[in-house]
A protein has these predicted regions:
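Nucleic-acid endonuclease domains
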Residues: 1-39, 46-150
């Protein structure tokens, strides 16, 4: 969902950051190839541009969660100066905040969080606070165990 001037760039940077983490090469991404599909095999990257805080949430739109069920969701926060930022400055940090499973998303509470442009987004999102996500130091092991078992 595009709700601000920087949403597309935020998503792209999130995918680049994850590719660097996962494959030690930011170029091993699927940007431009994955429209309407998960970002990486069995992994959906959820990137947001906000000042980093552990009270932020991994958000998955209810309608998206019904359409596709990647086994893993990873939250990345592009740490901008303001929640109303309309550009991403050079040397801005990306925090790979944590991960959740599709099952955890499906059992999470739902809420309309609005958008950067208005108080109502017109849709509900499943949400899990960043501080409640699995830590990234467990991700690769769980991911590769899941791949082997499928």
């Amino acid at each position: 969902t595009i709700a601000s001037k920087i949403d597309t760039l935020t998503g792209i940077l999130g995918e680049f950051a994850f590719a660097q983490y996962m494959y030690n090469d930011w170029k091993k991404n699927r940007v431009g190839e994955n429209k309407g599909d998960v970002n990486f095999k069995d992994i959906e990257i959820k990137a947001s541009a906000f000042p980093f805080s552990e009270s932020l949430n991994l958000l998955v739109r209810e309608d998206y969660a019904q359409k596709r069920k990647p086994p893993f969701y990873v939250q990345i926060i592009i740490d901008v100066n303001s929640n109303k930022a309309d550009k991403i400055e050079k040397d801005t940090k990306a925090y790979i905040a944590g991960w959740a499973t599709a099952k955890e998303i499906d059992s999470a509470p739902k809420k309309d969080f609005g958008s950067k442009l208005s108080d109502s987004g017109g849709y509900k999102c499943f949400y899990i606070q960043i501080k409640s996500l699995h830590e990234m130091n467990t991700f690769k092991k769980d991911y590769y165990n899941n791949v082997k078992s499928n």
